[in-house]
Amino acid sequence: MAVTVGVICAIPQELAYLRGVLVDAKRQQVAQILFDSGQLDAHRVVLAAAGMGKVNTGLTATLLADRFGCRTIVFTGVAGGLDPELCIGDIVIADRVVQHDFGLLTDERLRPYQPGHIPFIEPTERLGYPVDPAVIDRVKHRLDGFTLAPLSTAAGGGGRQPRIYYGTILTGDQYLHCERTRNRLHHELGGMAVEMEGGAVAQICASFDIPWLVIRALSDLAGADSGVDFNRFVGEVAASSARVLLRLLPVLTAC
């Protein structure tokens, strides 16, 4: 039986490319969220326009799993880079996500902790949600040798070919526009990129016991220029993230 993949995006720029290549599309609205069912490269998918943030994404992921019967859920879109070795246009595929804004406030600082737990109520040693290693192995094999085009000159591309990385992606309900915080999150939590939705996808999919994946293209570097960079690069890098998703659909429908 063919597996239906749920695909979540937060903003219109992230959905535009995928909606443009979706065939046999049928649209419905549930809880003010637009869902487009159809096929991408002959694979059954449901595209969802979640809106930004963890609550919107959690609601959307729940509907995809429960109402639409999706057996794998993917978030594809853009993110801010945390790792100084990365550049705008690079792709980060999560092998783990951490909600950096959930935890225990003490001495005016937040100690990140696993969602659903605090140190003195249901304590746990876990922090974050790992992607199924078998899924990551299939993803890496499928993307071996896969290349992405450099950003255009119009978008400020300098001819460098974007690279694909695997690592920790951080999630929080803030748009990061601060170099000090960026450096701290990278140093303390090992985050390669930061965004506002992936942690919710992971938490919901863990509850439903279904596979998930987060694919992010860097639209900015989460520092003082992040707003300028975002508007300059978002369209092109979001399309790059979508192309990676299309490449991965054969292995995601096998999950």
From Swiss-Prot:
Belongs to the PNP/UDP phosphorylase family. MtnN subfamily. Substrate binds at residues 80, 176, 196-197. It is an enzyme of class 3 (hydrolase). Keywords: Amino-acid biosynthesis, Hydrolase, Methionine biosynthesis. This is 5'-methylthioadenosine/S-adenosylhomocysteine nucleosidase. The active site is at 14 (proton acceptor), 220 (proton donor). One of its GO terms (molecular function) is adenosylhomocysteine nucleosidase activity. Signal peptide: none annotated. The lineage of its organism: Bacteria, Bacillati, Actinomycetota, Actinomycetes, Mycobacteriales. It catalyses: S-adenosyl-L-homocysteine + H2O = S-(5-deoxy-D-ribos-5-yl)-L-homocysteine + adenine; S-methyl-5'-thioadenosine + H2O = 5-(methylsulfanyl)-D-ribose + adenine; 5'-deoxyadenosine + H2O = 5-deoxy-D-ribose + adenine. GO terms for cellular component: cytosol. CDD domains: MTAN. Was identified as a high-confidence drug target. The gene is mtnN. Pathway: Amino-acid biosynthesis; L-methionine biosynthesis via salvage pathway; S-methyl-5-thio-alpha-D-ribose 1-phosphate from S-methyl-5'-thioadenosine (hydrolase route): step 1/2. PANTHER family: 5'-METHYLTHIOADENOSINE/S-ADENOSYLHOMOCYSTEINE NUCLEOSIDASE (PTHR46832), 5'-METHYLTHIOADENOSINE_S-ADENOSYLHOMOCYSTEINE NUCLEOSIDASE (PTHR46832:SF1). It comes from Mycobacterium tuberculosis (strain ATCC 25618 / H37Rv).
